[in-house]
């Protein structure tokens, strides 16, 4: 039984969050399909840059795990 992983890495000024299993369940966040996003360190994040099937699930991960506010696309930070 393989573990579910959420990888957070910093590369070339961008944060990449990769959900690497067909479905991911994080405690308190529910489950959602796999996908990946690249969050720019500066500028804004457009909805069409998000390649995750369940965007609500993604926003929960961004907010709860990463400390990224859904309505504040101007800044990204790790809590």
From Swiss-Prot:
Keyword terms of this UniProt record: Antibiotic, Antimicrobial, Fungicide
GO-annotated biological processes: defense response to fungus; defense response to Gram-negative bacterium; defense response to Gram-positive bacterium; killing of cells of another organism
Superkingdom: Eukaryota
Propeptide position ranges: 1-56
Known role: Has antifungal activity against C.albicans. Has antibacterial activity against the Gram-positive bacterium S.aureus and the Gram-negative bacterium E.coli. Lacks hemolytic activity against rabbit erythrocytes.
Protein name, UniProt field: Ixosin
Organism expressing this protein natively: Ixodes sinensis
